[in-house]
């Protein structure tokens, strides 16, 4: 990852925690529920972050942490927790205009009535497909899919790193295809 990110416990994902139990979904075999974030110290930190979402100074704290950085990824583990969480992320993005933000999400319900035109230009919300080899959601301009046969994400061929790729943050990339892992 070419930037800082924030993660939350994957078990707290509203939709993802359900999909993780269903074979053939993009959350089945979730890396964050397996090897990636299972150490007790990592779990404790993610639980603290989850609890902090409702703290009155969360938005100001995130603005302080992100200011001065060029890129930021929301939720390399976890997902949106509700409308207030999304609203606060939008406020953080408005206050950090020099940073490009990428917010991948499967929480479709939170976006279905949101006009993409009101989202700050430095925030790319990428709606993720729910099924492996399934179609991208057609109602949102920026999406991601997971495939067993093809990919556009170069990370698997680059030691798991983005290197100079920033497609996930780009409004010029309508869909990013990730290899199933």
Show which residues each predicted segment covers.
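Class I S-adenosyl-L-methionine
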Residues: 1-181
